[in-house]
């Protein structure tokens, strides 16, 4: 997979996850900075997931690939100087994955990956990535219940963000609707478009 990605775009879920990981390794090598956000991974990885499912990838395969990515996120440890370590000590460095929310047309954006990411969090209970769930009035009850069960495990995730408050607030600050509706979270709770 790594050899292929050196010269060709990803086609499968496994390849797309590996390409995503390469991006974050490069960012860390170049910037040694915290709070790089993978964003709405359940949206941009979904076409690769669907393609792979039609080619025989099982739920178990997809979960294992996702869990491997979650483990990789926990391998990066940010080196801080003594001044910033007093204020920002601790392991997490703010890789925030946003799931759910809505599409540009206002319909529900959750998909199989939204649930898969919740399951990976429930099984691993790792501090990274920060997993955030975007909700709104049309979020499926099943998704809310799945998230509630994961929250009940005590990892503090997923964090909950209300699209019905966030999107209008971003638009009130001059962010175009198509950008506001695709917001993600950086670090702990900071919004980005």
Locate predicted features.
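Conserved catalytic cores of very large enzyme subunits
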Residues: 1-193
């Amino acid at each position: 997979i790594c050899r292929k990605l050196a010269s060709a775009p990803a086609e499968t879920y496994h390849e797309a996850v590996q390409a995503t990981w390469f991006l974050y390794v490069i960012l860390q090598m170049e910037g040694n900075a915290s709070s790089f956000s993978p964003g709405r991974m359940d949206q941009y990885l979904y076409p690769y997931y669907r393609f792979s499912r039609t080619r025989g990838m099982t739920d178990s395969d997809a979960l294992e690939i996702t869990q491997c990515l979650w483990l990789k996120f926990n391998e990066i440890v940010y080196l801080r100087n003594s001044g910033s370590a007093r204020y920002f000590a601790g392991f997490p460095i703010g890789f925030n994955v946003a799931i759910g929310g809505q599409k540009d047309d206002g319909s529900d954006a959750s998909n199989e990956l939204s649930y898969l990411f919740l399951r990976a969090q429930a099984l691993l209970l790792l501090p990274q990535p920060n997993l955030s769930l975007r909700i709104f009035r049309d979020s499926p009850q099943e998704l809310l219940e799945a998230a509630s069960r994961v929250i009940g495990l005590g990892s503090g995730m997923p964090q909950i963000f209300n699209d019905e408050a966030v999107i209008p607030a971003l638009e009130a600050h001059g962010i175009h609707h198509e950008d506001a509706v695709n917001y993600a979270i950086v670090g702990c709770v900071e919004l980005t478009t």
